[in-house]
C-alpha cells in the first residue's frame, strides 16, 4: 500500500494562459494530487526539474518537446510515464510505450484547445479563455459563439485570457503579480472562469489594473524602425516592460494585422529579450526567424528569443525585416 501512496504525479505546465487553462481542464476532469512544476512563460525547460522514479507519472503542457527531449528521455528511462500536450515544433518525438503525445503545430490551435478536444468540450470556457490569451481571437470568438456564450461573457473570457497571459511574462517570478502555480490553484477550484471571477474578483482586478497601467506605458513608445510590413519596438529594462513584452506584441498585431512586429526588451546585463509576432494575415515564419539565434524558439505566428547578445541586435533587425519584406 505504501508503494502506491509514494507514486508521485508531476504537472509541468507553461506559466501562461494556455498552460494554466490546459491544466485546469485536465484536473477538473481528472483530479490528482500533484507536484506543480512551472515558472515564467519563457521558462520552458521544466522537465529538467523533475526527478522521477519507476511507476510515477508526468503531465507536460504547453512546453516545446524539442526543448525538453533529453529530460523526457531521462524520465522515460526512469520508468515513469509522460502525457504530453503541446502546439510548438516538437522536433523528433520518440516511440515509447510510456509516452502519450498529443502535439499539433497548426497556427490556429493551442494546448488548451487540444485538451478541449480530448475532453469533448467538457470545460470549454477555460479553453476559450486560453485561446484568447494566445491571441487566437477569431478561433476563440467562433468557439464562444458555438458554445452559446453571450457577447458580455465572451468579452469577459477575452479580458481574463489576456490578463492571465500577461501575468506570465517577466524575466523572473519577481516581475509577476502572481506565481503561475498560485494563479492556477486559485482558478482550479472553479468549473468555469465566470465562477472564478464572481468568487475572486480582486484577483482579476489586480491583473486587469496592472495590464492597463503597463500597456499605457508601452503605448507611449514609438517604433525604433518601421516599414510597410514590419515594425520594431524597444522597451526599457523595467518591470512593467518585462511584464508587457508579449501582450504588447499581440496588441500591436491586432491593431496592424498585415504587419509583423518585434518587441525588444533591454536586459540588465546589456543583452535583449525579443518577442516576434507574424502578421495575423500570414501567421508564418516567426519560428524560422528566431531559430537563426541560439535561444530562439516558438510557433509560426508567435516566437521569441530569450537572450539576444547586444552585438547581434542589428543582425536580428535585418533578418526580421527580410523575413517580412
Regions found by a protein language model. Give the residues of each.
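Loop-centered beta-sheet repeat module
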Residues: 144-191
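Oxyanion-binding "anion nests"
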Residues: 102-106, 186-233
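Alpha-helical structural elements
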Residues: 8, 161-164, 199, 206
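Short N-terminal helix-initiation segments at or just after the protein's N-terminus
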Residues: 2-3, 168-180, 199-212, 243-250
Amino acid at each position: 500500500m505504501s508503494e502506491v501512496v509514494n507514486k508521485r504525479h508531476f504537472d509541468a505546465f507553461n506559466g501562461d494562459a494556455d498552460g494554466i487553462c490546459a491544466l485546469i481542464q485536465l484536473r477538473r476532469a481528472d483530479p490528482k494530487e500533484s507536484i506543480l512544476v512551472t515558472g515564467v512563460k519563457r521558462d520552458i525547460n521544466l522537465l529538467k526539474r523533475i526527478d522521477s522514479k519507476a511507476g510515477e507519472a508526468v503531465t507536460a503542457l504547453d512546453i516545446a518537446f524539442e526543448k525538453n527531449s533529453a529530460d523526457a528521455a531521462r524520465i522515460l528511462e526512469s520508468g515513469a510515464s509522460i502525457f504530453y500536450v503541446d502546439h510548438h515544433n516538437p522536433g523528433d518525438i520518440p516511440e515509447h510505450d510510456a509516452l502519450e503525445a498529443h502535439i499539433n503545430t497548426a497556427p490556429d490551435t493551442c494546448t488548451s484547445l487540444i485538451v478541449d478536444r480530448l475532453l469533448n468540450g467538457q470545460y470549454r470556457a477555460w479553453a476559450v479563455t486560453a485561446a484568447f490569451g494566445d491571441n487566437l481571437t477569431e478561433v476563440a470568438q467562433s468557439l464562444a459563439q458555438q458554445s452559446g456564450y453571450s457577447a458580455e461573457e465572451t468579452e469577459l473570457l477575452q479580458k481574463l485570457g489576456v490578463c492571465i497571459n500577461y501575468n506570465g511574462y517577466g524575466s523572473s517570478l519577481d516581475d509577476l503579480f502572481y506565481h503561475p502555480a498560485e494563479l492556477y490553484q486559485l482558478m482550479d477550484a472553479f468549473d468555469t472562469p465566470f465562477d472564478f471571477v464572481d468568487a475572486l474578483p480582486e484577483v482579476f482586478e489586480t491583473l486587469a489594473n496592472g495590464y492597463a497601467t503597463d500597456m499605457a506605458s508601452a503605448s507611449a513608445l514609438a517604433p525604433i524602425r518601421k516599414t510597410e510590413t514590419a515594425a520594431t519596438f524597444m522597451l526599457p529594462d523595467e518591470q512593467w516592460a518585462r511584464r508587457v513584452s508579449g501582450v504588447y506584441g499581440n496588441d500591436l498585431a491586432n491593431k496592424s494585422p498585415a504587419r509583423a512586429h518585434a518587441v525588444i526588451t533591454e536586459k540588465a546585463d546589456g543583452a535583449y529579450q525579443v518577442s516576434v509576432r507574424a502578421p495575423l494575415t500570414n501567421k508564418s515564419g516567426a519560428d524560422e526567424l528566431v531559430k537563426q539565434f541560439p535561444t530562439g524558439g516558438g510557433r509560426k505566428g508567435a516566437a521569441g528569443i530569450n537572450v539576444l547578445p547586444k552585438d547581434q541586435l542589428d543582425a536580428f533587425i535585418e533578418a526580421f525585416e527580410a523575413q517580412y519584406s
